[in-house]
Amino acid sequence: MASPRWTSSSCRRFHSDFIYGLLILRHDRRRILWAGATAHPTAEWIARQLTEVCGWGQAPQYLIRDRDRIYGATVTRRLWALRIRDRPISPRSPWQKAYVERLVGSVRRECVDHVVVLGERHLRHVLLSYMKYYNETRTHLSLNKDAPMPRAVQAAGRILCLPILGGLHHQYGRI
């Protein structure tokens, strides 16, 4: 029997499932309104997410979106029912929704690239944790180094460090 050598090879089949994320961003303060995840995105799922984020009376005036086929008649009808004006961008023009493109890059660089996602539920948890960090703690130069949800200046005291996403990010506060 031959001993293993560098010329020996081994193979193992594997598959990778994709999990899709949905981020909805409010432009005025760059606040993430919604973060969702699914393994099987459909027009019905997108419509349900829009209803969850907008409710029936809290809807924004416009939805700026790309021209993906998933935004079909079902989503268009839901936007009409929520009284949201649909504003698809021009074909192959991602710069027309630059704030969201920047957000997706931040989520990838600051979060998902450093976490092994174990499934749809886990990705949803990771995105919601990052959304809380992004909205309440992470500073933005365009907001004069404030967070999307403004916070009061804290009184003098001992500084406490709270880990976020298992220590990937930290929030500092005074007690």
Give short role names for the model-derived ranges.
Residues 1-175:
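Charged DNA-binding/catalytic regions of mobile-element recombinases
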